[in-house]
Amino acid sequence: MDLKKKIIITAAGCAAILCAFAGVGHLLPKQEPIELETVSDEVPAEEEKAPFEVEAKGAVMVDADTGQVLFQQDAHDELPLASVTKIMTMLLVIEAVDDGKIDLTDEVTISQRAASMGGSQMYMEAGEAHTVEELLKGVAMASANDGCVALAEYVAGSEEIFVERMNKRAEELGMRDTHFVNTNGLPVADHYSSAYDIAIMSMELYKHEKTREWFTTWQDTMTVGLPGKEKEFGLTNTNKLIRQYQGCNGIKTGYTADAGYCLSASATREDTHLIAVVLGCETSDKRNEEVSKILDYGFANYETHVVAEKGDVFEEIDVEKGTPRKVNAVAAERITALVSKGETESVVTKATIDKKVKLPLIKGDEIGKLAVYDGEEKIGEYPLVADGDVNKASFGELVSRFFDSLF
């Protein structure tokens, strides 16, 4: 058989194989996975105690980037949380904004029920209208009970339906020691949470950058009242720590006689972002003192090391039946590891790439995982995604590649 016939037969066989596997992309990663060195140390496990106690019924501190627990004291005890409830209320509203279901500029008419709320409020009257953003600002800064009910009714049709969604969202977030009965935390039976659960929803809310404007604004004004009876209402942030504690940038205070003085506080210094929660303190000064003590401990003992920035490349992938043939597996998000100050133990990252993907591949599609280890212990796993689109290679392209491989 001459060379020409051999090539024709070989090409025909190749075509049959290519047809059989059309549409499936085989990822051929490099032989050696990329490992990235950084520094780390063991941090207190969830059941471990910090070397001091605070005067609170429940307390916790977490790394806001990873959720790693750095301090806890009765962190899972079910306790009343007063206006700290409003973290979940704000979360559902801002998620509705991000999902395009409502807009910050939408006008909300205040119902009689919303206007009748007692406690901290903006003293709005039934029938007046305010934007979603104005109401959110009032809730974040002045802890407005009337604003909570108005927003709940606008988003869900009624406060009751909105509360059902609050409990569903809590379940989705893994908040196992939480049950909501209303949107604002006014005293009612069977309404409770834990310091740990509050930290979880605080982390989630803080992901929404718009809310940070309201958390860190000390004073503002808004106009309230029916047409012809308008008046200026002053908003003063209930969280004094935003002016008293270095790096404090949120989040929410709370107080009722039953709950005591409560606070979920966020603070950032350089790359380290911590969230500390206290429940059931005896005075507002004690609440601020204990939160400050916890945060001081965190910043004194830990620092954040950036393992990868969003878009960092961990593998160059050969997509066998794709065009283009190459795509990078990159970090889908910024990845950090909290480490003890002064320690130099290594954190190692290892990329694992999926063996096959369905084509076409869209930029941002997950194609692997990045595992982060502290010694032998896995401390996190993060998605690796494609940094570009990969379409199915045409039959002609595949045949051309085959012949290129022969010569």
Feature names for model-found ranges:
Residues 1-35, 403-407:
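Gram-positive cell-envelope targeting signals
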Residues 25-196, 200-209:
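Active-site-adjacent loops and short helices of periplasmic peptidoglycan-processing enzymes
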Residues 1-2, 175-176, 187-192, 196-407:
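Domain-terminus/edge residues, biased toward the C-terminal soluble/receptor-binding domains
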Residues 3-8, 81, 132, 395, ...:
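Structural motif marking the loop-to-transmembrane transition
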Residues 18, 45-47, 262:
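A generic local structural motif
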Residues 12, 52, 56, 108, ...:
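Hydrophobic alpha-helical segments and their boundary regions
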